[in-house]
Swiss-Prot record:
GO terms for biological process: defense response to bacterium; defense response to fungus; killing of cells of another organism. It comes from Fagopyrum esculentum (Common buckwheat). It holds the Pfam family Chitin_bind_1. Not glycosylated. The keyword Plastid does not apply. Disulfide bonds join 3-18, 12-24, 17-31, 35-39. InterPro entries: Chitin-bd_1, Chitin-binding_1_CS, Endochitinase-like_sf. Residues 1-40 form the Chitin-binding type-1 domain. The keyword Lipid biosynthesis does not apply. This is Antimicrobial peptide 1. Keywords: Antibiotic, Antimicrobial, Chitin-binding, Disulfide bond, Fungicide, Plant defense. PROSITE patterns: CHIT_BIND_I_1 (PS00026), CHIT_BIND_I_2 (PS50941). Antimicrobial peptide active against plant pathogenic fungi and Gram-negative and -positive bacteria.
Amino acid sequence: AQCGAQGGGATCPGGLCCSQWGWCGSTPKYCGAGCQSNCK
């Protein structure tokens, strides 16, 4: 599911990070630069 600006402001389940592209994940690619929510 999409999150952040691309997902209408939605956050990710389970505390996952929302990447700059609006996708949920737990790796630095998602949690690092550009992260939109639940960032590390």
